[in-house]
Amino acid sequence: NVHTLTPAWMMSFGDEKQRGQESQALVYDGIIYVTASYSRIFAMDARTGEKLWTYSHRLPEGIRPCCDVVNRGAAIFGDKVFFGTLDAGIVALDRITGKVVWKKRFEDYKAGYTMTGAPTLIKDQRTGKVLLIHGSSGDEFGVVGKLFARDPDTGEEVWMRPFVEGHMGRLDGEESTPTGGSREPKTWPRDENGELVEAWHHGGGAPWQSASFDMETNTIIIGAGNPAPWNTWKRTAKGDDPRNWDNLYTSGQVGVDPSTGEVKWFYQHTPNDAWDFSGNNELVLFEYQDGGKTVKATGHADRNGFFYVVDREDGDFIRGFPFVDGITWATHIDPDTGRPV
């Protein structure tokens, strides 16, 4: 009886601000919450479409969104609704009144940082704490991608984890550990003077999409974006083969400990990504039986044209296969190494 459906109501997101619309609406307790372009959010009566409140974030001059002024969604916890802003901020609003409860700016928007992805609420299975998880955007402008955990009541940062090898993380306001375990990255080259190439200082790897959470293994699982800059020779030793420089931890999927922000595991879909394939598309958690054993896995359809199945307990590659025709950058994924050929 689909042919009998008719519109009950409709609304416009508004005049000159009606730009790209990429948000997934939330419906909670009879209210629809939906974000829109230019860092706006609307609350509407689900039955009548009546606009209950609107919050329009005051954006400064100099914001640098790469790919239109979009927002990809909000999250709800308790009496608050959370969403990111194009000036590298995140805002908590009272979900009934739309009044600001708190707002935080996590990085410098003039450097190219923004936030477009929907945040995620998780409960750390070890500590019992509820955490607000969000990433940064801005790979195209050469920023270091970062994942954050916050106290949803106050907005205070709990930890921050950069997704470029050798960059330092934070825990409880103090430096914690470098990503990859060392300040001497092995997958980023050095120049003729023995210094890390300029590209490393920017790096990319932004986790701009929403995270998944595996309660059983207590792991945040999220995609890491493309390395920066796009120019692969900037991320490769002079005269060398790009395939020798993977540029970790970009263009892959990352398992993160919610208690500490430490990287538990990483699998890279596209080493030294030169095509902006990124690795941010959603990671679906599922289980299947293999020889009587239950395998806990992630499923990921990457923009590089291959579908990946990865063990979500340790990040080990299980299988990868093409799901589109006309792939030219690689012939297949090596079944033993998990690397493109």
Residue ranges: model-predicted function:
Residues 10-26, 54-75, 103-121, 141, ...:
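Extracytoplasmic beta-rich repeat domains
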Residues 29-31, 78-79, 124, 129-130, ...:
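Short coil/turn segments that connect the beta-strands within blades of beta-propeller domains
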Residues 32-34, 83, 132-135, 222, ...:
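Residue position within the beta-strands of beta-propeller blades
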Residues 39-40, 89, 138-142, 227-230:
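Short glycine/acidic-enriched loop and turn motifs that connect beta-strands
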Residues 45-48, 94-97, 152-154, 258-260, ...:
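Short loop/turn segments that connect beta-strands within beta-propeller blades
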Residues 86, 140-143, 238-249, 300-303:
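Short, solvent-exposed loop/turn segments at conserved positions within beta-propeller repeat blades
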